[in-house]
């Protein structure tokens, strides 16, 4: 049975549009690294995608090298050990620190790391579970979407034009937004998430902005 917090998430995003069962080996592997509440959601819900790929719960193993690259030479590299637990359809990575929880989001499209200073503290197991519950309960669809140059949310329009995102796909912009590209539908392409985020991470050191 779902708890109220994940229920709020489902009320906002709807049921999963893509479902991936999490193997028990993955749950066992991450027991000592991620909160029990997150592993419970993995077991009962899965590594699912919602809203045709607008937000996905992900396997941290798939993003370890990308997270390491984006955090390299930042204050966060040595402050905690971070793992990706969620991804947006435009390549934002939601991170969970083993000690401090969910306080970083890497916005790869905008070359920015958003840092929640108020949530940056070492947490007990109980606090870590509450942190995960709060993370999901407080998500909103608009927080993962991007407004185009006319202030119109663009994700659903991209899905209409290019189709839903597959498991390893994101929508990217050509040229990249932080290189001067326009935020418009015609600039969007479906891209392999790993290749795209790796390429974006090689241009310049990301900005750090307090959320």
Go through each PLM region and give its residues:
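Intrinsic-disorder-associated interaction segments
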Residues: 2, 121, 125, 145-152, ...
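Mixed-charge (acidic/basic) macromolecular-recognition segments
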Residues: 130-184
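Compact, glycine/acidic-enriched structural inserts
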Residues: 104-145
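A surface-exposed partner-binding patch
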Residues: 1-104, 164-211
């Amino acid at each position: 049975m779902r708890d109220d917090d994940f229920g709020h998430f489902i009320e906002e995003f709807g049921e999963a549009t893509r479902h991936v069962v999490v193997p028990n080996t993955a749950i066992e592997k991450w027991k000592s690294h991620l909160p029990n509440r997150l592993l419970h959601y993995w077991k009962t819900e899965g590594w699912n995608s919602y809203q045709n790929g607008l937000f996905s719960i992900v396997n941290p193993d798939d993003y370890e090298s990308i997270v390491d690259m984006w955090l390299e030479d930042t204050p966060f590299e040595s402050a905690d050990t971070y793992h990706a637990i969620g991804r947006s359809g435009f390549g934002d990575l939601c991170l969970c620190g083993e000690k401090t929880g969910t306080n970083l989001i890497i916005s790869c499209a905008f070359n920015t790391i958003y840092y929640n200073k108020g949530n940056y503290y070492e947490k007990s197991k109980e606090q870590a579970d509450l942190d995960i519950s709060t993370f999901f309960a407080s998500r909103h669809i608009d927080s993962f979407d991007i407004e185009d140059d006319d202030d119109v949310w663009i994700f659903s329009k991209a899905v209409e034009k290019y189709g839903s995102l597959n498991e390893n796909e994101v929508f990217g912009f050509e040229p990249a937004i932080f290189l001067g590209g326009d935020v418009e539908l015609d600039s969007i392409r479906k891209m392999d998430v790993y290749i795209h985020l790796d390429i974006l991470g090689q241009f310049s050191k990301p900005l750090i902005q307090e959320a």
